[in-house]
């Protein structure tokens, strides 16, 4: 899978490191020469120093072969413009970082549906840590209509009981348990 990331700040570099560790083929774009030099020296990826809102530069990355284009700069306008340009190359997956949540509607108005705000995401995660301190991991589904979470149950009312005796209820369904360190999906 071929992924192009525009922006080599904290978000872009962190994402690049994770994707490289997972074995993905990356091209990284930034207009800051020192960030480009640092990334080129440290990462197993093609690094192009230039403006990601330039069509000719995007063509140099073989944008038409990309499976993903991810705009991670802290500049919403640059992210928006690059995503608009990338759409003409039929990249199947376009993701944009938005710094100002008020700008999210502008991205959606031009068909960029995958818009992420690291600040809002972090705030939501922190809120979950406060409101659900026993939850080890949490996945929200859809628009937050449902959630899957991993938690340790210490309530004497349910510990040691059969799953069919306590689930489903109107509030939850148990979909798996750990027994002796192994994941067990009930029948």
Question: Where on the chain are the PLM-derived regions?
Answer:
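Cytosolic regulatory regions of ion transport systems
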Residues: 1-187
């Amino acid at each position: 899978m071929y992924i192009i990331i525009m922006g080599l700040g904290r978000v872009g570099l962190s994402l690049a490191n994770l994707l490289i560790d997972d074995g993905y083929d990356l091209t990284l774009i930034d207009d800051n020469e020192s960030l480009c030099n640092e990334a080129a020296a440290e990462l197993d990826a093609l690094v192009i120093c230039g403006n990601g809102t330039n069509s000719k530069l995007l063509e140099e990355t073989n944008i038409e072969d990309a499976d993903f284009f991810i705009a991670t700069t802290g500049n919403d306008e640059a992210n928006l413009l690059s995503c608009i340009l990338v759409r003409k190359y039929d990249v199947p997956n376009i993701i944009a970082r938005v710094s100002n949540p008020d700008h999210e509607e502008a991205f959606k108005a031009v068909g960029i549906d995958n818009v992420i705000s690291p600040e809002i995401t972090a705030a939501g995660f922190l809120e979950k840590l406060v409101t659900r301190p026993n939850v080890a991991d949490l996945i929200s589904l859809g628009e937050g209509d449902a959630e899957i979470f991993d938690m340790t149950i210490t309530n004497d009312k349910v510990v040691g009981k059969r799953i069919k005796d306590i689930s489903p209820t109107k509030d939850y369904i148990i979909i798996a348990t750990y027994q002796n360190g192994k994941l067990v999906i009930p029948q």
